């Protein structure tokens, strides 16, 4: 959605969409979206709970990874603000119209307004959505950088916290995310420069991934060699195995994310060029917003310890009920065994008595 302030050169670029639909249909779709987001939030928060309860990775890695999952809440706040404008719960005082293109320079497809009055909350929601997207992009690169540092400082990284590493990486990634998000909203940069962080970070992350994989596989091969001359401490061996475990998990998550981004990218392009009806924008938009479903489930089921805890926690009432049923069945079996033993004893003594009479 592009907003143009009349009698000025000011433009506002928001990653929000509005559709020309009856209010009843908007209400029905919004109820579905809210229900899906509530369930998605439950899955996400449960996944974060499991990751924090069963910490299998270094504290610095968790410091960077958990916020990447939790930042979805910021995205959903922006989504809820958009829904409020669609349903006219927040009314700017004029019709917003239909806006289903990602970006355009066509004046007929932009929203012409006298000023930003009444749109402040929508602009804030749009900023939250842009900020979430770029926080994930730079956050992934920050995680890859932290794992590179862990591989370089293999001698004592496991035994020393070095909490300043994730703090510095977080500050840098957030400064970049906030700066680019503000620049996009004010259209200080166009679509090409807006895509540039993706173009730069993607190959950089792949190169870092290959470096970490090669380094740690070489170290593991050396550790497993009985004729090695180099001495590896227990913490160093654990660090190598942790890096490789993180890579395996990261590979699966990257495949899911690439698949997700590809579908969303094709969908947004199809909407922009009018290849599909505008109504399909709901499907593409919600497909993007509900990304924690595949990502969290992939993470939880990739590691056995997380998977077991996740299964126990996802339906606590059902699990408690099953535990009670299992306990009752066990007690009944024990009682039946005791009764059977008692009957057999009575029969034995009765037969013994009869044999003596």
UniProtKB/Swiss-Prot annotation:
GO terms for biological process: sensory perception of chemical stimulus. It is found in: Membrane. Its main location: membrane. The keyword Transmembrane helix applies. Keywords: Membrane, Transmembrane, Transmembrane helix. One of its GO terms (cellular component) is membrane. InterPro entries: 7TM_GPCR_serpentine_rcpt_Sre. It is a multi-pass membrane protein. The chain crosses the membrane at residues 31-51, 61-81, 121-141, 165-185, 192-212, 253-273, 283-303. Belongs to the nematode receptor-like protein sre family. This is Serpentine receptor class epsilon-30. It comes from Caenorhabditis elegans. The lineage of its organism: Eukaryota, Metazoa, Ecdysozoa, Nematoda, Chromadorea.
């Amino acid at each position: 959605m592009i907003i143009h302030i009349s009698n000025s050169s000011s433009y506002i670029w928001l990653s929000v969409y509005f559709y020309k639909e009856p209010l009843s249909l908007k209400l029905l779709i919004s109820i579905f979206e809210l229900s899906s987001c509530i369930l998605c939030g439950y899955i996400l928060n449960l996944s974060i709970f499991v990751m924090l309860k069963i910490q299998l990775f270094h504290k610095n890695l968790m410091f960077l990874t958990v916020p990447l999952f939790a930042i979805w809440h910021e995205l959903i706040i922006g989504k809820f603000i958009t829904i409020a404008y669609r349903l006219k719960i927040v009314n700017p005082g004029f019709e917003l119209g239909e806006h289903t293109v990602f970006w355009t320079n066509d004046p007929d497809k932009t929203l012409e307004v006298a000023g930003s009055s009444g749109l402040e909350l929508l602009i804030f929601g749009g900023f939250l959505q842009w900020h979430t997207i770029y926080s994930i992009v730079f956050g992934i690169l920050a995680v890859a950088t932290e794992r590179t540092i862990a591989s370089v400082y293999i001698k004592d990284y496991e035994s020393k916290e070095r909490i300043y590493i994730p703090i510095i990486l977080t500050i840098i990634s957030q400064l970049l995310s906030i700066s680019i998000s503000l620049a996009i909203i004010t259209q200080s940069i166009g679509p090409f420069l807006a895509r540039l962080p993706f173009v730069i970070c993607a190959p950089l992350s792949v190169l870092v991934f290959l470096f970490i994989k090669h380094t740690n596989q070489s170290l593991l091969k050396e550790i497993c060699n009985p004729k090695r001359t180099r001495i590896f401490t227990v913490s160093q061996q654990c660090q190598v195995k942790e890096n490789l475990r993180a890579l395996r998990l990261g590979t699966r998550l990257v495949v899911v994310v690439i698949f997700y981004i590809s579908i969303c990218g094709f969908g947004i392009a199809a909407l922009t060029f009018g290849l599909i009806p505008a109504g399909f924008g709901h499907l593409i938009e919600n497909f993007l917003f509900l990304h924690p479903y595949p990502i969290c489930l992939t993470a939880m089921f990739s590691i056995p310890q997380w998977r077991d805890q996740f299964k126990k926690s996802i339906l606590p009432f059902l699990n408690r009920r099953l535990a009670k049923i299992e306990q009752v069945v066990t007690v009944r079996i024990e009682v039946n065994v005791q009764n059977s033993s008692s009957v057999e004893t009575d029969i034995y003594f009765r037969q013994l008595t009869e044999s003596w009479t």
